[in-house]
Amino acid sequence: MIKMIKNVAIIYPNKFKAGISCLAVHVLANHLSKYRDLNVGVYFLENYDRIKNFDAIFITLQYENDYFNAIKIIKDLRKNNPNAIFVAGGPCVMENFFPIAEFFDVFIVGEIEGSDVMLKVINREFDVEGVYSKYLEKDKVKRIYPKKLTIDDYPIYQPTSEEGAYGKSFLLEIGRGCPRRCRFCLARAIYYPPRFRKLDDLMYLAEEGVKVNKVNKVALIAPSVGDYKYIVELCNFLDDMGVHISPSSLRADTLNDDLMRILKPKTLTIAPEAGSERLREFIKKDIRERDIANAIDLAKKFGVEKVKLYFMVGIPTETDEDIEELINLTKKVKKEIRKVEISVNPMIPKPHTDFEVEEFDLSSKKKIKYIEKALKKEGIRVEYENFNSMICQCILARGDENLSKYLDYSKNPTSLISALKKDRLLDKYLGRFEDKGVWKNIIL
């Protein structure tokens, strides 16, 4: 019996330069490539219009504000793909997919490695663990995930580009999930429990990945790279290979001489998140002033040219004094390092976190402008996201099915906010919740 080849698309609903640096895209493509009766293609905003007469279209949702692109893509493709099922997955789906439930046929909640859930969905088998579909009569869905991270489903072949966030590099995922307790962090919740890869596996993957992709750079991927038990040994191995090492994130309290000597970073990134020690303790961001001071000493010792600090404002219990301490901490760093930048954005109360029912602080915009003004005179550059974009992120993160009618005709964050404001619904999604929202039906 001859099996019919099925055409399957994986779409990253944004530009190529963002999608090519997304490990999930490579994981999905590699995972589906093992099925011989599937013809799999990867697409981005620039080329999705080539998709015609496909059987299944998977869209990975990494960021809430990509929903606008995703909805447009679905509307465009349904015309030329009348028999296709549209499937969503990714961190946003684990967080809360209900605002976009109307637009997709199926949601896969969780991590697909070690399972055949994608193949089952392609074959129209929806009544399986980890799958939510409007064609099924069930209101709850339980996340699926591999108990251990192995090399079996890891994408050694990864098409690369200088345009990507990491340039031409091999993406090496050290671990998934985070052992820290930060109360605001979505990743801690949706990727629990934290799992790290074996050192031998990482060495093998690095060697093969560099050889197969003909690159001389390895980007280390994990919520907190420095928390990996064998990080120094791994970096020594990569250094001996003669490749450049690019860590995605390092905590101030995990830095040491050995790590700095190997990494030789030109820019050191530190995320205190809050300016005062009191507020950091409250959000369980366990970084002390002495940890930051030690990181700055190491930066000076190893010739770091620039330090970038990441902060949030609008944190519950925050006071004017906390804002002043944020400013003073940044000034202290500037006295030690010539070039200092900070990124400051409002805290988004995310589903499944300790702050999921808290209100979004609309006064954050004024706080950010105040910080910018105070630091500009010190020669410190202050970066921040578009405020409407952050408001929209909160709305979409905590929204319900009623948002779909607004998303149906809203082309961007500003138009969605305007529509909700007109119908006096902004406070429903930005204000304090009395209880958990619809995301309580997603069991992590």
Swiss-Prot record:
Cofactor(s) required for function per UniProt: [4Fe-4S] cluster
Binding sites annotated in the UniProt record for [4Fe-4S] cluster: 178, 182, 185
Keywords: 4Fe-4S, Iron, Iron-sulfur, Metal-binding, S-adenosyl-L-methionine
Top-level taxon in the UniProt lineage: Archaea
Domain Radical SAM core, chain residue ranges per copy: 164-381
InterPro entries per record: Elp3/MiaA/NifB-like_rSAM, Radical_SAM_N2, rSAM, rSAM_horseshoe
Matching CDD domains: Radical_SAM (cd01335)
GO molecular function: 4 iron, 4 sulfur cluster binding; catalytic activity; metal ion binding
Cofactor: binding details: Binds 1 [4Fe-4S] cluster. The cluster is coordinated with 3 cysteines and an exchangeable S-adenosyl-L-methionine.
PANTHER family recorded: RADICAL SAM DOMAIN PROTEIN, SLL1084 PROTEIN
Protein name per its UniProtKB record: Uncharacterized protein MJ0966
